[in-house]
Amino acid sequence: MDRFAALRGSLLLREFSDVGVRILAEACEERSVGRGTYAFRAGEPSTALCFIGRGTLQLQLREGGQALGELKSGDTVGNFALLAEGEHLVSAWAATDVELAVLERGAFETLRKQKPQASLKLMLALAQDFGERLREASGPLREFLAWQVSKRQA
């Protein structure tokens, strides 16, 4: 898999220059997930931002449960892993063979020291992505997210 191509195709990095994408791609590792296996399971530590280079991941609340949605080439998963420690809230099951470019928290910390501008731009892109998702959320999910944000500000 071409890590640069996987990251260049990511919506999260749409405003990055090729130089910025290359810097991030060099910090990533490649990971393959075979069809019918899990990239990660709900409750496991979330330690990396994953760029989907090829394939389809289905998100499930429980193993073998109904799919909540699908992520494909150009999508990312684990967006908060670089910003805060926590667990995966859902499981990611490979509906097809999947190729990921994985930016581990440790590699991001090294990048933060060596290339602070690129890491800051990534953090801003993650924050913008979260804001867009919050605006697009509806119903109980939107109310829950708004409550979580207001609770932290109190």
What kind of region is each of these model predictions?
Residues 1-154:
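Cytosolic regulatory regions built on CNB/CRP/Popeye-like sensor folds
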